C-alpha cells in the first residue's frame, strides 16, 4: 500500500504508579467472623431477623407519615391526628409562608 498499514492503537492502561497505590489496602467496612457454636449461630440469626423487622416497621411508619401530608415525617403523630399540622398553620410553630 502506498499509505502504509494502519497503526494499531493500544488502549491506554493505568499508569504504574496508580496500580501500586491500591495494593495492600484493605476494603473499608466491618469484619466479622461467622460463629461456629450452634448457640451463637441461633443468636446471630435471631438478631438479624429482629433488626430486619425493626427496619421494616420504621419504613412502614415513614411511608404512612409521608402519605398524610407535607413534612409529616418530621412531626409527631399526635399533632397530625388532632389536625394541627395539616394546613401548615400550627399554633406559633414554624414559619408561615
Swiss-Prot record:
InterPro entries: UPF0390
Record's compositionally biased regions (Polar residues): 48-57
Protein name: UPF0390 protein CND04920
Region annotation (Disordered) ranges: 1-57, 75-97
Matching Pfam families: DUF2462
Family that this chain belongs to: Belongs to the UPF0390 family.
Biased composition annotated in UniProt, kind: Basic and acidic residues: 29-46
